Amino acid sequence: MEKLSVYMITKNEEKRLERSLEAVSKVADEIVIVDNGSTDKTEEIAKKFNAVFVYNTWKSFSAQKRYAQNLCANKWVLNVDSDEVLSDDLIKEINRLKENFTKNAYKLRVKDMYPGWKKPRLLSRTYNIVRLYHRDYMDMPDDYSNDRPVALKKNVTVGNLKAPVLHYSYIDLTQRIDKWNRYSSEFMKTAKGKKKKYSSLRLAMEFPFQFLRYYFVRRYIFCGFYGLVESMTAAYFRFVKIAKFREEEIFEREKINAEKR
């Protein structure tokens, strides 16, 4: 049977971490947690599950994930967030796979969960993303994010797991807005490094386009109140991240002009 390392990154996750670790401990031979300076009980909870708990200064989302992955002792790794819970059926599915992995990587079905939900809503959004993989067959890109998968090498075989991961990303609206704001700032830095360009037309159209995309294409329309709120806030911060990028361009030009004076 193959050994499996589970890795995650944290900061002040005492409200959600224990439920996540209770689930992953049923499949993991090793749990690695990289923390960015928690001041709550995150470390105490992690150590209840004998996790390797390491502090690392935050540079970017992808850098933190890569650092955690590279600390893993095993070749087979599972990338889980602290707000995600493996379903009972997925735990069984992964444990069966550990006896004989037939692919190089596997996509997990992630289902969003919101306050008051006992189970995922029918027709609500499900997204498939590579989270379980053999480290020899992938690269961690610099712009890695939860909705952008790891970069698989050529001729890699990918399987699909059937049972879901339950994603409890939403605590309350304040937490959600704070999270989106951090993500938009991170995007701005990544886009700046890639020398991207965004037009005024793109900026103007971003909010309405993204709202329609989230609400209808991503099926948040089936998530009731939280689906509407999530679509509005996500679309707004998609607009904000481009606005932050354009603002940074203005600041850079002002700095250059000031130096020329």
Language-model features and meaning:
Residues E18, D40-F49, D89-L90:
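Acidic helix N-cap motif at the loop->helix transition within catalytic regions
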